[in-house]
Swiss-Prot record:
The gene is suhB. Homodimer. The rRNA transcription and antitermination complex (rrnTAC) consists of RNA polymerase (RNAP), NusA, NusB, NusE (rpsJ), NusG, SubB, ribosomal protein S4, DNA and precursor rRNA; S4 is more flexible than other subunits. One of its GO terms (cellular component) is cytoplasm. It comes from Salmonella typhimurium (strain LT2 / SGSC1412 / ATCC 700720). It is found in: Cytoplasm. Substrate binds at E67, L86, D87, G88, T89, R183, D212. Pfam families: Inositol_P. This is Nus factor SuhB. It is an enzyme of class 3 (hydrolase). Mg(2+) binds at E67, D84, L86. Belongs to the inositol monophosphatase superfamily. One of its GO terms (molecular function) is metal ion binding.
Length: 267
């Protein structure tokens, strides 16, 4: 196992334990609003602190980028740990048991290691560049769908960017006529992990942040899928507009989305 993957798994499991314990004692959870329709809890912060501490013990020189506390610049900026300590905070607050810890390691701009951990199901999704993706140690392969017929697609509503609401609904309408059904779970990290596992056939979302998808992106790629922006390019790291699935599913999704995209979403 890649040495950084070992530490990422250790950090994810420790954070997962913090999350699971607090899920059982909801009265101890303190939630606040940090932005429009965007929440944070004391549990997000506690899980993040555990992850940072675990990384720092082994790699004190590395840079860490987190959702809640921003960038912790290290002396080695070529290595970045990109962390979402609790992806699916709203689900957690509402006691809907679907959320995950997401940790990715990027070296010189390429994601090399990925972990997405679901503490409620004890499902550990891992990937190392060039070595495949796994779920609890078993090799993952994504969907073998040849087009959108019969597929289940996952998505997330653009609740932080409601200026795209009409465009988003139009895209959903276009895709829904071609696929079998949609799922909207509330955790982009798990959506991408589920694409890697073949539980859903494709995924798209508007305006994600790097910590939402950095780990999930590598899981998808290492399970035989591809990830692109809304025009089939690679600008999703900047825009957060992301489409994922096997090559044929992504091609079909992009073809259906194309005519509905505003200029802002074509970047």
């Amino acid at each position: 196992m890649h040495p950084m993957l070992t530490i990422a798994v250790r950090a994810a499991r420790k954070a997962g334990n913090v999350i699971a314990k607090n899920y059982e004692t909801p009265d101890a959870v303190e939630a606040s609003q940090k932005g429009s329709n965007d929440f944070v809890t004391n549990v997000d912060k506690a899980a993040e602190a555990v992850i940072i501490d675990t990384i720092r013990k082994s790699y004190p020189q590395h840079t860490i980028i987190t959702e809640e506390s921003g960038e912790h610049v290290g002396t080695d900026q070529d290595v970045q740990w990109v962390i979402d300590p609790l992806d699916g905070t709203t689900n957690f607050i509402k006691r809907l048991p679907h959320f995950a810890v997401s940790i990715a390691v990027r070296i010189k701009g390429r994601t090399e290691v990925a972990v997405v951990y679901d503490p409620m199901r004890n499902e550990l999704f891992t990937a190392t560049r060039g070595q495949g993706a796994q779920l609890n140690g078993y090799r993952l392969r994504g969907s073998t769908a040849r087009d959108l017929d019969g597929t289940i697609l996952a998505t997330g509503f653009p609740f932080k960017a409601k200026q795209y609401a009409t465009t988003y609904i139009n895209i959903i309408g276009k895709l829904f006529t071609e696929c079998a059904d949609f799922r909207r779970t509330g955790s982009a990290a798990l959506d991408l992990a589920y694409v890697a596992a073949g539980r859903v056939d494709g995924f798209f979302e508007i305006g994600l942040r790097p910590w939402d998808f950095a780990a999930g992106e590598l899981l998808v790629r290492e399970a035989g899928g591809i990830v692109s922006d809304f025009t089939g390019g690679h600008n999703y790291m900047m825009t957060g507009n992301i489409v994922a699935g096997n090559p044929r599913v992504v091609k079909a999704m992009l073809a259906n989305m194309r005519d509905e995209l505003s200029d802002a979403l074509k970047r």
